[in-house]
Amino acid sequence: LYTLPEENISFKGEVQPILENRCVVCHGCYDAPCQLKLTSAEGIHRGSNKEKVYDAARLTAAKPTRLFIDAMTTEEWRQKDFKPVLNEGDVNKVRNLENSVMYRMLRQKQLYPQARTGMLSDDFDVTLDRAQTCPTLDEFDDYAAKHPKGGMPYAMPNLSRKEHTTLVHWLAQGAPIPDDDVPSKVAEKQIKQWETLLNNGTGNTSDNKTSLVARYLYEHLFQAHLHFEGTDDREFYRLVRSSTAPGKPVEVIATRRPYNDPAKKVYYRITRHQGSIVAKTHMVYELSGKRMQRFEELFYDAEYEVTSLPSYEPDIASNPIKAFAAIPVSSRYKFLLDEARFFIEGFIKGPVCRGQTALSVIEDQFWVVFFDPDADIMPLKDDFLNKTANYLASPAELEDNFKLLASKTHYKTLIEKYFQSKVAAVKNNGPVDIRDAMNYIWKGGGKNPNAALTIFRHLDSASVNFGFIGDYPETAWVIDYSVLERIHYLLVAGYDVYGNLGHQLNARLYMDFLRTEGEDYFLTLLPAEKRQLIRDEWYQGIRKSDRNIAGVDLWMNMEFVSGYKTGNPQRELYQQLERYLGPLAGDGDYINRCRDEGCQPKASKNVIRADKAMQRATKMEGLVVKILPDVAFVRVKMGGKPENDIAYTMISNKAYHSVTSMFQHESLHDRRDYRNDTQTVVRWLEGSYPDFFYVVEIDDIENFVDGYNAIENRKDYEQFVARYGQRRTSEDFWKHADWFNQQYAREQPRLSGIFDLNRYQNR
């Protein structure tokens, strides 16, 4: 069979790198085929399950199957209908292979290797919603006969001989896996300090105050990958609710949502994150002495009283405006703003890690700024928010009650009342000059990059980054406290990926209101006479129904600012924001927006050459963009060491007449506005789901861009791919995939994760 080495194969040194680079690239999240999550030992031992996590049409909520939460042992997972992929029978090297679905999948690929050139044949289904076949050991022979090309890695190049042999040796040896990682010595001391703060306060805080603050922090950080000051860049932790006190082994309290009733005494504990880090769920939150001082300033030392603790009933717990009313709005808002990108990432990378339901309501590229927490603005005042808190309830309170379209009825009425309250509060305010109005915008203290963000959306995935990136966008948001908080509780804390159709539809429809609110705040900074025209241009068709929301028209017609000097106030506003935010807005974006040579960052001759060439690629626009991948990574080879090559991301920004329907596929002509599609190019790796790779030598970069800009139809694109693309069949595919992951780690040593290849195109 195989000659096994005398020493056990090292899981971390030999096996895990192969799993991460060849298997986790598809098996890393809720959308891992057959729920086979290969990011950790626990996921491998758990095995597979035929039920899909993502099922927007289900009428009843599914039982959650979250790794490290909903079951802790292999036996418990078997009770939840997970089937083994490793041998669980008689243990010997032959049985360990014969009885391993994982081995047989690998063997199937060796027996039926895929083509090494051209596109994959039509019998390969690489669509995201493809039917899944999840054979058990007893079903495998039938599966292999029906799907001879269904070996692993599916629809990707074969493993190398060395990779295959290493995995087979490991499986034959019984798939030995070391114990879980434990906290480092540097982290241990800090964990004790943080657990003391969360569970006991500062010594000067009441029990109620300590409990309320800890609950607030947990409900906002429960999905964070916590990183402690002074620890390794790749060492992360999780904040959990445990039934055991600090000093004892953690026993996670499993609830469907972080604000559900724990039904027992809660201790807030910090535990080591186990397994591989994948880009699509990696959200880093830094904990340090400085952060602790900030929390003490905002929450523990601030003067307020907590006379009673909020209920865990859904109508209270899902509405943070009500649940945490005792904590000053300023403290809550500043906490969110300090790491605004993290909280925006929450609905991009959180439970909705395949987020068509949530993300289909936002544009493909837009900018975000925030109201200043110290500005004299009514929606930021405690009294106003406390009086309107009932209007700020969201469908999260329904949990999985099947109240279809509640967001179009009950919650629409609440939104109308909130709008009317805002109008009444500001109706007597006169307009201010646009330059003075800039003082309403948070400037991040002149140093916090979270003050200006850009969001890119690509159908059902998205990314967010610091600064204003790309050309001036069609739309932008100005966010206040209640919008940011409600986004978190609707799509992160309150979103159940296992929920039913009603839950998912109502979340999506309510997010439409939140997007509108952020956009309308931006519009209020424009002249009233232009505002409605711009808004009508943004969205056509179905979106016009927004006018039916009582209060919106009046809000749109109120004059808030004056002093515009051009006929294009929207661009003028963007430029005002750029000047006001200064370096926090970015470097001017030489590739996409600023044509002045002064915007070109200092770089080597070849990098400048590549930048100038890629600048021309941003001229690609209109109908042809629909042919191109949403997110394409470009490797420009510099002729030296691989680590000296540079990476670009080419992003297709799709324009829409409407972003209001969750059921219409984005390609339907009544939604898409192909003529206004654009391209953005950045000199870094953006996004978690690359759709395609291009590789080009620096001396060929001008020809690369010329060929790219010459694409007019599908045939032109296929010819371009034949020259520069890395197809699923390409002999060097894995080499370049590895390079992009390594390059991401070089660019972002702490924030990087393994890219997901589930969406990689067959082109």
Give the positions of each predicted feature:
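Aromatic- and Gly/Pro-enriched helix-to-coil junctions and flexible linker segments
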Residues: 1-763
